[in-house]
């Protein structure tokens, strides 16, 4: 008989593969889409005295990414100017960041966020970790391709020159996007072996065998690892997250924690990140914007559901409390509704 865990795993698999990503996205393709009309309306909005931001927001947050690419193409054909450049001049602040993010393809957006996280002095490890830990094989392979196209260098090369030690090894292994895909066969022997190996390499021994942790957590499929982390609890007095906190520190600890949370429940991981970006004084807008833009066509509905379940109030409510103006309007459209 199937255990509850197997059923949940199967459901999460189906959520990730069998249904088109848009099924859980808050932004859908616009039905009566007309790229020429949208391009004309955006052109008029940009030329309006003081810029008609409302029209720009209304159009671009209510079109799918593919449709936005068509609008950009139509706009360039009309005006001989790039839509992104025109909007960069017309808008400012956080709203500009959201709108320019929406104009990029998902891989271009991730590639540019990764580049920004490693540019100049110091690395924004937080952004690097979030993107590298949460993207699928397919997404990572596409990011690698686009990154090289955009920056004439390999993503791996930039990660290597910007990070060090075991943290570098973990990031490089993940960035390759070579994790095993979820299969239909469940290998209980390997699940048990991996759970024991993770325990033997960490909590059980005096020092941590980090390469062993890295190889298991970056090579095995997501569904397999969900079962491994369950099984792990029968060997270790601590669960995987507690073990990580005991065994490693700094960026490596942060990366392993993010990775395990993504594997266990990705929508919940993003719900937590969104909550953290808005709690307390001041908003971490960079994180808020990146998640709202990058997940709007992937799993925003699941994220909203996890958010409400855990924090008692809706994501929509939190965004309303924490942001204002047309920036708020854009984020609320991407959120797709109140719960």
Curated annotation (Swiss-Prot):
Cross-link Glycyl lysine isopeptide (Lys-Gly) (interchain with G-Cter in SUMO1) mapped to chain: 49
Keyword Acetylation recorded: yes
Annexin repeat segments: 33-104, 105-176, 189-261, 265-336
Region (S100A10-binding site): 2-24
Alphabetically ordered keywords of this record: Acetylation, Annexin, Basement membrane, Calcium, Calcium/phospholipid-binding, Extracellular matrix, Isopeptide bond, Phosphoprotein, Repeat, Secreted, Ubl conjugation
Phosphoserine modifications at: 26, 184
Gene this chain is encoded by: ANXA2
Job of this protein: Calcium-regulated membrane-binding protein whose affinity for calcium is greatly enhanced by anionic phospholipids. It binds two calcium ions with high affinity. May be involved in heat-stress response. Inhibits PCSK9-enhanced LDLR degradation, probably reduces PCSK9 protein levels via a translational mechanism but also competes with LDLR for binding with PCSK9. Binds to endosomes damaged by phagocytosis of particulate wear debris and participates in endosomal membrane stabilization, thereby limiting NLRP3 inflammasome activation.
Anything else known: It may cross-link plasma membrane phospholipids with actin and the cytoskeleton and be involved with exocytosis.
Tissue specificity statement from the Swiss-Prot or TrEMBL entry: Expressed strongly in velvet antler reserve mesenchyme.
Matches recorded under SUPFAM superfamilies: Annexin (SSF47874)
Subunit structure: Heterotetramer containing 2 light chains of S100A10/p11 and 2 heavy chains of ANXA2/p36. Interacts with ATP1B1. Interacts with DYSF. Interacts with COCH. Interacts (via repeat Annexin 1) with PCSK9 (via the C-terminal domain); the interaction inhibits the degradation of LDLR. Interacts with CEACAM1 (via the cytoplasmic domain); this interaction is regulated by phosphorylation of CEACAM1. Interacts with APPL2 and APPL1; targets APPL2 to endosomes and acting in parallel to RAB5A. Interacts with S100A4. May interact with UBAP2.
Locations listed in the record: Secreted, Extracellular space, Extracellular matrix, Basement membrane
Organism: Cervus elaphus
GO cellular component, one term: endosome
Protein name per its UniProtKB record: Annexin A2
């Amino acid at each position: 008989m199937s255990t509850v865990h197997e059923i949940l795993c199967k459901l999460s698999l189906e959520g990730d593969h069998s249904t088109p990503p848009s099924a859980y996205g808050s932004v859908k393709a616009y039905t009566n889409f007309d790229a020429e009309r949208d391009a004309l309306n955006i052109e008029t909005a940009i030329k309006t005295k003081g810029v008609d931001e409302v029209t720009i927001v209304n159009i671009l947050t209510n079109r799918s990414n593919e449709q936005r690419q068509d609008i950009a193409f139509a706009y360039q054909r009309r005006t001989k100017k790039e839509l992104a450049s025109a909007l960069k001049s017309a808008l400012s602040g956080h709203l500009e960041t959201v709108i320019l993010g929406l104009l990029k393809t998902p891989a271009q957006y991730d590639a540019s966020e990764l580049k920004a996280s490693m540019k100049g002095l110091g690395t924004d490890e937080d952004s690097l970790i979030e993107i590298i830990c949460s993207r699928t094989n397919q997404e990572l392979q596409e990011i690698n391709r686009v990154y090289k196209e955009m920056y004439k260098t390999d993503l791996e090369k930039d990660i290597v020159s910007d990070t060090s030690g075991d943290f570098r090894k973990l990031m490089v292994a993940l960035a390759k996007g070579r994790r095993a895909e979820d299969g239909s066969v469940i290998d209980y022997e390997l699940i048990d072996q991996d759970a024991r190996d993770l325990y033997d390499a960490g909590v059980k021994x005096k020092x941590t065998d980090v390469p062993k942790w890295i190889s298991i957590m970056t090579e095995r499929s997501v569904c397999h690892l969900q079962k491994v982390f369950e099984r792990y609890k029968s060997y270790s007095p601590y669960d995987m997250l507690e073990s990580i906190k005991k065994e490693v520190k700094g960026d490596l600890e942060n990366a392993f924690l993010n990775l395990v949370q993504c594997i266990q429940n990705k929508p919940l991981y993003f719900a937590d990140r969104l909550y953290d970006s808005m709690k307390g004084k001041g908003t971490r807008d960079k994180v808020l914007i990146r998640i709202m833009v990058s997940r709007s066509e992937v799993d925003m509905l699941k994220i909203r559901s996890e958010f409400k379940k855990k924090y008692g109030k809706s994501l929509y409510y939190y965004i309303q409390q924490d942001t204002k103006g047309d920036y708020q309007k854009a984020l609320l459209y991407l959120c797709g509704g109140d719960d």
